[in-house]
Amino acid sequence: MKKSIGLVGDTGRMGVLLTQALLCRPHCFLGKGFSRRSQTSLEEVVTENDILVDFSSPEVTSLLLDFLLKTPRPVIIGTTGFTNDSGVKTKLSALSEYVPVVVCANTSLGAYVQKRLAAFAAKLFSTSYDVRILETHHRAKADAISGTAISLAEAIRSAKAESYEEEPEPFIEMHGSRLGNVCGEHEVSFVGEDERFVIRHEVFSRRVFSGGVLLILEKIMGEGLPKGYYTSDVLYESLFQEKVFG
């Protein structure tokens, strides 16, 4: 049976791309969506769809989770920029007790590969190397340091802690720029006295993000993800294992 997919933020950049992509999918169909200007309520979108995909705003995501906790549905959260006191993380954790919850700051394969390489490099370069993360996005993006950049920093810190068997206190320099209509650029640099090692990922089209969402949807619908909290890395990790070691 075809699954109904509800888009929250269906008139935004990602929402429009996903709408176009979902119209061509054989195993699902586009259900009622929600935007700030839509006549459909958020509660309707939750109750009348099988799976929710959210690319909206932190405020709307928080409200969406309130409804999902009453009527649990599998959900993919692509919204970023949550504050620590917003309560969203607590709601996501609670919802994951009932259904699969996939939280993804960046759904592109390239972003996953960059993170893997950055973590690997962090294990090899000593703490004498300075680490810098630069990110650039379009001027309308709300969060000043992107979720992807934060995720990169977390991966580097985790790798160094594992490598040196204790939690280090390295300073990771982070910079964010908001320029024009840039889809997304992330650069990680390891800088020593005599060399600089750079890992750079640049997105030319948001289609790469919608393609990642479709892969996650296929995993939810095809394999029947069990309830739990996931990131897009989980999907790409299985792909990585298959391609490299399979």
From Swiss-Prot:
Family matches, as NCBIfam families: dapB
Record's catalysed reaction(s): (S)-2,3,4,5-tetrahydrodipicolinate + NAD(+) + H2O = (2S,4S)-4-hydroxy-2,3,4,5-tetrahydrodipicolinate + NADH + H(+); (S)-2,3,4,5-tetrahydrodipicolinate + NADP(+) + H2O = (2S,4S)-4-hydroxy-2,3,4,5-tetrahydrodipicolinate + NADPH + H(+)
Keywords, sorted A to Z: Amino-acid biosynthesis, Cytoplasm, Diaminopimelate biosynthesis, Lysine biosynthesis, NAD, NADP, Oxidoreductase
Residue positions binding (S)-2,3,4,5-tetrahydrodipicolinate: 138, 147-148
EC number assigned by the record: 1.17.1.8
Binding residue positions for NADP(+): 37
Any matching Pfam family: DapB_N
InterPro entries: DapB_C (IPR022663), DapB_N (IPR000846), DapB_N_CS (IPR022664), DHDPR_bac (IPR023940), NAD(P)-bd_dom_sf (IPR036291)
Listed pathway(s): Amino-acid biosynthesis; L-lysine biosynthesis via DAP pathway; (S)-tetrahydrodipicolinate from L-aspartate: step 4/4
Residues holding NAD(+): 9-14, 78-80, 104-107
Role: Catalyzes the conversion of 4-hydroxy-tetrahydrodipicolinate (HTPA) to tetrahydrodipicolinate.
Domain of life of the source: Bacteria
Entry similarity comment: Belongs to the DapB family.
GO molecular function terms attached to this record: 4-hydroxy-tetrahydrodipicolinate reductase; NAD binding; NADP binding; oxidoreductase activity, acting on CH or CH2 groups, NAD or NADP as acceptor
Protein name stated in the entry: 4-hydroxy-tetrahydrodipicolinate reductase
Gene Ontology cellular component annotations, sorted alphabetically: cytosol
Localization, UniProt: Cytoplasm
Enzyme class of the recorded protein, top EC level: oxidoreductase
One GO BP: lysine biosynthetic process via diaminopimelate
Catalytic residues as annotated in Swiss-Prot or TrEMBL: 137, 141
